[in-house]
From Swiss-Prot:
Nucleotide-binding among keywords: no
Annotated Gene3D superfamilies: Cobalt-precorrin-4 Transmethylase, Domain 1, Methyltransferase, Cobalt-precorrin-4 Transmethylase, Domain 2
Keyword S-adenosyl-L-methionine found: yes
GO BP terms in the entry: cobalamin biosynthetic process; methylation
Name listed for the protein in its UniProt record: Precorrin-4 C(11)-methyltransferase
CDD domains: Precorrin-4_C11-MT
Keyword annotations from UniProtKB, A to Z: Cobalamin biosynthesis, Methyltransferase, S-adenosyl-L-methionine, Transferase
Enzyme class, spelled out: transferase
Species per Swiss-Prot/TrEMBL record: Mycobacterium tuberculosis (strain CDC 1551 / Oshkosh)
InterPro entries: 4pyrrol_Mease, 4pyrrol_Methylase_sf, 4pyrrole_Mease_sub1, 4pyrrole_Mease_sub2, Cbl_synth_CobM/CibF, Siro_Cobalamin_biosynth, Uropor_MeTrfase_CS
Amino acid sequence: MTVYFIGAGPGAADLITVRGQRLLQRCPVCLYAGSIMPDDLLAQCPPGATIVDTGPLTLEQIVRKLADADADGRDVARLHSGDPSLYSALAEQCRELDALGIGYEIVPGVPAFAAAAAALKRELTVPGVAQTVTLTRVATLSTPIPPGEDLAALARSRATLVLHLAAAQIDAIVPRLLDGGYRPETPVAVVAFASWPQQRTLRGTLADIAARMHDAKITRTAVIVVGDVLTAEGFTDSYLYSVARHGRYAQ
C-alpha cells in the first residue's frame, strides 16, 4: 500500500501531470482539499472509489483515514492543489506517516505561480532585469512568518516577488514592500483563480494595486506578482540562443 501525494495543479483539470492522472485513475481511495479541487478532476477517480473531502478534517483525522487504508491494503491518492512542495501541509502528513511506517510517494504538480505567469504571458526571470524569484506569503494567526522573512526584508533585493494566500491583506502588503525598497511605480500583476474558467487578471503598480483589487473585489485565491519583469521590453537576449554561443559550438 502506498499514499501518493499528488500535485493536482492550479485548477484546470488537464494541468495535472500524466503520472498524477494515472495514479488518480487507479487508486481506490482519494483524499482531497474540497473548495479548491475541480469536480472534473475528481470524476477521474475509479468507479466505487472512496472519495473524502479533507477540508473539515483535522490532521489526526486525515492520518487515521490514511492508516485505515493502509490496514486494508488500499492505495491512496492524496490530492493537493498546485505542487505539494508549496503551502500544502505536506510536511506534517509525511512526518506522521513516517512514524507509522506507512509508505508514500510525492508526485509534483504545476504550481499556481507558474499558471499565473502563463496567464500573464510573462517570464519571471528576464536577463538583465531579474534572475531571482522569491515565493512567499504573509503572516496569519495560524502561520507566523519566521524572523528575517518579513516582506520589507525580502523586498530589498528587488527581485521578482510572488505572493500566495495574500490577496485579502493587500493594504498591509504594499507599505511593507515600499519600505523594503520597491518603488511606487514597480509593476504588479494579480491573477485570481489561475487556469480556472473564472480566471481574472489585473495589472497596476504598487501605487495603485490595492485600490484596483478593491474595485475588482479580488480577495482570495489569487497570486500577486511584483517586479520589473512584468513590463520589461528592452532587455538583453538570453545567451542560451545567442549567435556567440552557437558559433562556439559550431567551431
